[in-house]
Amino acid sequence: ERLSQFGISNIHVALRYLGEQISDHYKDGSDIGCKLSYVTEVEPLGTIGAVKLIKNINQEYVILMNSDLLTNIDYEDFFNVFIERGADMAVATIPYEVPIPYAVLEMNEDKFVKSFSEKPTYTYQSNGGIYLIKKSLLELIPNQGKFDATDFMNAVIDGGHKLISYPIRGYWLDIGKHNDFEKAQRDIDHIQF
């Protein structure tokens, strides 16, 4: 439903385990304001490999996303930043904090301590599972075999294409684990969509 709010009306869904439950529930997508079509992975093809099963991609740009996410990402801003920066691909990112339980020393080239931080927390930008891609780059996906988003991003970089990150400023949660799914159910009434 969220995608259709941003004018994304043709959605392809890759199915595998218990996929018929999804297709039986959403059918052709008309109840949620879009046109849904389904492809079925006979064997696992990775997080991006199933794209090769889709026969007709008619748009110049493609959004790929993991299906086990709850987010209120602003897709319009995501697209505008992608265009403004002249990107070939954008990956939506989320901050991931890594607390270090000890003091961390920073050394110079002579191995003298030049500074230290007591129990710092480092923040990294992590893959948020949402990608905006120029259709022409889909040729980098092999026709057979498992191919993950990380493989694809490496192929994009190795090919000299422009890959940018887009920090998600709103809500994002991977609901693939039972505890996180329960959290999403508690949070959903308080999220601005």
What spans do the regions from the language model cover?
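A short, conserved acidic/glycine-rich loop-to-beta-strand motif
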Residues: 85-95
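Conserved N-terminal catalytic core of the sugar/cofactor nucleotidyltransferase
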Residues: 1-67, 77, 144
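Catalytic-core segments of class I nucleotidyltransferases/pyrophosphorylases
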Residues: 63, 70, 76-83, 97-99, ...
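Residue-level signal for inorganic ion chemistry
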Residues: 22, 54, 68, 82, ...
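Short, conserved catalytic or adaptor-binding loops enriched in Gly and charged residues
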Residues: 28-32, 106-108, 155-157
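Short, high-confidence coil segments that cap the C-terminus of an alpha-helix
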Residues: 8, 59, 86-87, 160-161
